[in-house]
């Protein structure tokens, strides 16, 4: 032992030994479904999110983080495998296990490097992927809970049964679009899973091995179900409707998708083109906000437990949303576009030894998370990973970084149809989209939004006078691809 210690000291003096790598940090990996960057720390003062705000005050908040594709499984597939959509070929209902059975996912990479694994809730999309990735170390809800922690009242289950027999749009598994129930946090699966995750943290504390604990919150995804006390944080009279009511001017047939997701729920408009009334819109928005505050409280419980166990000082905490969401914006209730309201997400990282309370406006992508966490942990970044570690931004948030980032969206018609896909390149100034017929390469439509002068993306200016040069430049960037966006760190 004395020889080993002397060797370490000698290496340290010679500059070859990094003591930080001798004690790998733990990872608390927090995924939140359908979470918009509509949090107090992001400037949304109407939202009560004190615990996520606390995390931001202790870490680095990214204000310009975007997903690769604005739908649950495809977005998560890029983050968890390190592959971009064009390479993993997951666009909607496919699973990682079906298309990438041998992929070295982020959790597998950490496991191979000596990390203990555990996961609760929604990390991937399908149960089969969770079981394949985590085995018996994953769980989601419990049969001990009413309705397995989805709905909390019999009234909601009665409405679910009515919805199964709806004459216009029946759905086997959708009840009301929202629920306010006088129950404890643990009555819903998110609260139950948080309690289980806390138990696991206590078990991990007894071990000398680092851990990778993934906690995936299903809220604020539809249905907007949360304990009543979180609804009460938002009095009905305080809720405002969406500011942008119409589709972007000069948009095309591919820009938006009909809001079929909301129509699946009981009591919601069932016909295409039918909008929700104002009262329903305000109730839905209130329910979404309640769910955000519910998840925020659960995040707070996890952070508090890290503190009480003495684990916070050696744990990387990362919180991310898998895509944005339209709460009546553009008269839509879904994600599923290349518009920034759907691709932009909250991303916050707190890492040991790094300054907190910082914000970065740099362009980053969720595919960058895999290499970043590997980098922070002193692990090799696998060669297949197509993202870029943004650890330099954690140290210097205003560092010159990526000039552009990339998203895509395969167009839906009556059923999923990949023959026409919208490829988007985003810079600090513009969001440019080309809708391309994949079989021929023909560009059918284009869009250009000015992110500086029109951050809500209300006008497609691609054909307006004075934008020819911008269109040409953005087209070149799109064709150059993500490899040309890798920053050079000096």
Descriptions of predicted regions:
Residues 21-435, 440-444, 455-486, 490:
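Formylglycine-dependent sulfatase
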Residues 1-3:
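N-terminal secretory signal peptides that target proteins for export/translocation
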Residues 6-16:
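Sec-dependent N-terminal signal peptides
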Residues 452:
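Residues forming the ATP-binding cleft of Hanks-type serine/threonine protein kinase domains
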């Amino acid at each position: 032992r004395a020889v080993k210690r002397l060797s370490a000291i000698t290496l340290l003096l010679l500059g070859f030994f990094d003591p930080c790598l001798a004690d790998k940090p733990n990872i608390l990996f927090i995924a939140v479904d359908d979470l918009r960057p509509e949090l107090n720390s992001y400037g949304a003062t109407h939202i009560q999110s004190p615990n996520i705000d606390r995390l931001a005050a202790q870490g680095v908040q990214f204000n310009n983080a975007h997903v690769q594709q604005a739908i649950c499984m495809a977005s998560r597939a890029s983050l968890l495998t390190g592959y971009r959509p064009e390479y993993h070929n997951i666009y909607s209902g496919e699973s990682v296990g079906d298309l990438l059975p041998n992929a070295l996912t982020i959790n597998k990479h950490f496991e191979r490097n000596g990390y203990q694994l555990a996961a609760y809730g929604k990390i991937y999309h399908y149960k089969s992927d969770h079981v394949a990735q985590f085995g018996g170390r994953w769980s989601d809800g419990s049969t001990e809970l009413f309705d397995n922690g989805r709905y909390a009242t019999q009234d909601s289950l009665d409405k679910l049964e009515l919805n199964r027999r709806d004459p216009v749009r029946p759905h086997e598994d959708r009840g009301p679009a929202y629920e306010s129930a006088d129950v404890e946090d643990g009555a819903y699966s998110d609260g139950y899973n948080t309690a289980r995750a806390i138990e696991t943290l206590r078990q991990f504390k007894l071990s000398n091995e680092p851990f990778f604990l993934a906690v995936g919150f299903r809220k604020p995804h539809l249905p907007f179900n949360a304990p009543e006390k979180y609804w009460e944080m938002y009095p009905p009279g305080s809720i405002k409707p969406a500011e942008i009511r119409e589709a972007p001017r000069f948009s095309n047939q591919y820009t938006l998708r009909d809001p079929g997701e909301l129509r699946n729920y009981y009591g919601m408009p069932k016909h295409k083109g039918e909008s929700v009334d104002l009262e329903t819109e305000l109730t839905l928005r209130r329910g979404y906000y309640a769910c955000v505050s519910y998840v925020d409280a659960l995040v707070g419980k996890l952070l508090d437990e890290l503190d009480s166990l003495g684990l916070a000082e050696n744990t990387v905490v990362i919180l991310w949303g898998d895509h944005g969401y339209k709460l009546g914006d553009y008269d839509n209730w879904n994600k599923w576009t290349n518009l920034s309201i759907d691709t932009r997400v909250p991303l916050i990282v707190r890492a040991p030894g790094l300054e907190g309370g910082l914000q970065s406006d740099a362009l980053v992508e969720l595919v960058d998370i895999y290499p970043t966490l590997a980098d922070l942990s002193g692990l090799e970044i696998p060669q297949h990973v197509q993202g870029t570690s943004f650890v330099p931004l954690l140290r210097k948030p205003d560092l010159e970084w990526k000039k552009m980032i990339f998203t895509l969206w395969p167009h839906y018609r009556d059923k999923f149809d990949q023959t026409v896909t919208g490829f988007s390149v985003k810079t600090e100034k513009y969001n440019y989209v080309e809708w391309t017929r994949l079989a021929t390469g023909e560009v059918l439509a284009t869009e250009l939004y000015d992110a500086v002068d029109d951050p809500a993306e209300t006008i497609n200016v691609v054909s307006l006078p004075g934008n020819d040069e911008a269109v040409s430049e953005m087209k070149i960037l799109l064709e150059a691809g993500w490899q040309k966006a890798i920053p050079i760190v000096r």
